[in-house]
Swiss-Prot record:
Keywords: Glycoprotein, Membrane, Symport, Transmembrane, Transmembrane helix, Transport. The keyword Transport applies. Glycans are attached at N175. The lineage of its organism: Eukaryota, Metazoa, Ecdysozoa, Nematoda, Chromadorea. The chain crosses the membrane at residues 16-36, 55-75, 93-113, 192-212, 234-254, 265-285, 303-323, 386-406. It is found in: Membrane. This is Putative sodium-dependent excitatory amino acid transporter glt-6. Its main location: membrane. One of its GO terms (molecular function) is glutamate:sodium symporter activity. Belongs to the dicarboxylate/amino acid:cation symporter (DAACS) (TC 2.A.23) family. Residues 505-542 are annotated as: Disordered. Residues 505-517 have a biased composition (Low complexity). Residues 1-15 are cytoplasmic. It is a multi-pass membrane protein.
């Protein structure tokens, strides 16, 4: 029995080598991080420890843009425009529903557990940056503006964002004072890839290609092959994930400051957020999946383990996108046309973990300041957290989102810096939650559109055509029918008839297997010539 169990474990490790190595890298990173803290390593040493992880993250982020272009266009180009619209509407509706449910769950848990303790306010907490003029309307308008970039090339490295600039009047008042400072809204560009705008562009591009039909077949084939090449490259790069994840986690732990004074309060805060994220992942989302599909959600969890661990290690949904696609298609059986559309869109707007985290963080800060939020303010927090999680999902660490919600309900922003000490952990957990949510979304969308996908395959199935062509080539290569070449007697007979007819065009086609256009009934199947052709030495070659 023990020998069989050991053999099963060895077999599992062999079949899931990358998964085992990735999980071990997370454990190793935590052990090294806490084990090396007493050594008080220098900044140069910390920089060297973080260096492999930084390179790994840069390589993964490098693949985001070509992966989105190739996967989205290749998937939508093989679908009908009506089916693409239904898929997009279903996906967005699901993401909005789960974000609202996550926000409600977070507000409920933080109200019941009550992790905020006003007695620790005596602790010296550094001031956090403030952007008090940003409103939910600005966030929503920025979201829409970024959906339609004026320059698709610029969208690969910049996105639009509303800021408020303080302007001092140039003309002094009559009493000699300079007057009040005027705050003016400014719409500018900030660094960062505008993924939402790129997704909108690729979606339209792919739908137009699908409408062109056979005329755009060569373009479809190009993007399908490009997608396969990029995915093969990504699979190769993922073998460097264990080293990168170990260095990232170890470096983050070594850079933490001493948090012993507020450890108990922060521990309860972390417990509240993690409890909400876990409940949302194992109860809310699976229940929605079961009610819609009537299928067991456990295979989705099992198939996405590798992607979830990678998301926890990298703390980046975009960097995990290639691994998510591979797990969803290979282990969960989701159609690539669905996964290549839903996952890139989900990495931008599906931020259930962020919505829950932001709602808990805002009410936690209110509890620290002994502020009792009214029902209207709680509703404001829930709505703003949902909008901010979608519109500002790509902002690192959720800083702007939390500041936005705090200013909406009039809470102080100085306590946000306290949350940074544990945000490295919560960021990884909520990223894993978002990745799993994307997987369930893709599975549910496939269930809803399965009949339409089958109908599309029946109308025009590239895979079946390609398979048929391959089988035809195989049958030709294995055919026992002998190949022929023209004998000397046949050549002489052919030249005699050609000279008699005086047709120079026929003379230029000596050796052709096509039938002549004259009265000469000479072809490779002519049985009147004895023997017209002789077999080649190797009759197996085509």
């Amino acid at each position: 029995m023990k020998s069989k169990r050991r053999d099963d474990i060895v077999q599992f490790c062999r079949e899931n080598t990358l998964l085992v190595m990735t999980m071990f890298s997370v454990f190793l990173g935590v052990v090294l991080g806490f084990g090396l803290r007493p050594l008080n390593l220098s900044q140069e040493t910390l920089q060297l420890i973080n260096f492999p992880g930084e390179i790994f993250m840069q390589v993964l982020k490098m693949m985001i843009l070509p992966l989105i272009f190739s996967s989205l266009i290749s998937a939508l180009a093989q679908m009908d425009a009506k089916e693409s619209g239904q898929m997009g509407a279903s996906t967005v509706l699901y993401y909005l529903s789960t974000a609202v449910l996550a926000t409600i769950l977070g507000i409920f848990l933080v109200t019941v557990i009550h992790p905020g303790d006003p007695s620790i306010k005596g602790t010296d907490i550094s001031e956090a940056p403030s952007d008090g003029n940003v409103s939910p309307l600005d966030t929503f308008l920025d979201l829409v503006r970024n959906m339609f970039p004026e320059n698709i090339i610029q969208a690969t490295f910049e996105r639009m964002q509303t800021t408020y600039v303080a302007i001092r009047p140039k003309i002094a008042s009559k009493n000699g004072t300079s007057g009040n400072i005027i705050v003016k809204r400014s719409i500018g560009m900030t660094k960062g890839m505008n993924i939402l705008g790129i997704i909108v562009f690729c979606t339209g591009f792919g739908i137009v290609i699908s409408q062109l039909g056979e005329r755009a077949r060569i373009v479809v084939d190009f993007f399908v092959i490009l997608d396969a090449v990029i995915m093969r490259w990504v699979v190769t790069l993922m073998w460097f994930a264990p080293l990168g994840i170990t260095c990232l986690i170890c470096g983050n732990l070594l850079e933490l400051d001493d948090i012993s004074d507020i450890a108990s309060v922060l521990a309860l805060y972390v417990f509240t957020v993690c409890a909400g994220l876990i409940l949302h992942t194992i109860i809310t989302v699976p229940l929605m999946y079961f009610f819609i599909t009537r299928e067991n959600p456990l295979p989705i969890f099992k198939g996405m383990i590798q992607a979830a661990v990678t998301a926890f290690g990298t703390a980046s949904g975009g960097a995990t996108l290639p691994m998510s696609m591979q797990c969803l298609e290979d282990h969960c059986g989701v159609d690539r046309r669905i996964s290549r559309f839903v996952l890139p869109l989900g990495s931008t707007i599906n931020m259930d973990g962020n919505a829950l985290y932001e709602a808990v963080a805002v009410i936690f800060i209110a509890q620290l300041n002994n502020v009792q939020l009214s029902l209207a303010e709680v509703l404001t927090v829930s709505i703003t957290a949902t909008i901010a999680s979608i519109g500002l999902g790509s902002v690192p660490a959720g800083l702007v989102s939390i500041l936005l919600i705090l200013n909406t309900v009039g809470l102080p922003v100085r306590d946000v810096s306290m949350l940074f000490t544990v945000d490295w952990l919560l960021d990884r957990v909520r990223t894993a939650v978002n990745v799993l949510g994307d997987a369930f979304a893709a599975s549910m969308v496939q269930h809803l559109l399965q009949k339409k996908l089958d109908q599309a395959d029946a109308r025009h199935d590239y895979k079946t055509e390609l398979k048929g062509e391959i089988e035809l080539l195989k049958s030709a290569a294995t055919s026992r029918r002998p190949s022929f070449t023209m004998s000397e007697a046949s050549k002489e007979l052919f030249l005699t008839h050609a000279n008699t007819a005086g047709n120079s065009r026929i003379g230029s086609r000596i050796g052709s297997r096509r039938p002549s256009s004259t009265n000469l009934h000479l072809s490779w199947r002519n049985n009147n010539i004895e023997p017209p052709y002789t077999p080649l030495p190797n009759d197996e070659n085509v």
